[in-house]
């Protein structure tokens, strides 16, 4: 009788371990969306910089024409705070692939008031401006809840995204770049 009970307990433990393995595998794939960012799935090279405008007086032209103001550090090093200040994030993208890349920039803060994204070519000429944020009108429900932009990076070319974050409250806005397919799959 004890052997039979021991056998049932061993089978129950094996099933429990198998279930925990499946749950941990699924959870690790769902919890870490940065695993699928473009710098890990395509030959796209990224360079980061930022500037904190404590006076909220700097304009786009001022920031672009004074590159010495920038701090060249990853966005994870930005000293985010609740103070009334503008954050200017610079993201240089270089597509070293022989294929063009459809890119989605996801701004992971649905509570940001005003988020302006300037897309520049390699000569710092403005290509397009995007306005996102919960104070902006004429956005789709998806753009309100998941702030993002879509754009194309041609093969063997580079672009720059300049992101201005102007908000009251939580200003921390992680920026993740995905290929279009991976963004849809997430």
Task: Annotate the PLM regions.
Residues 27-186:
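Soluble non-transmembrane domains of integral membrane proteins
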Residues 13-22:
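Bacterial N-terminal signal peptides
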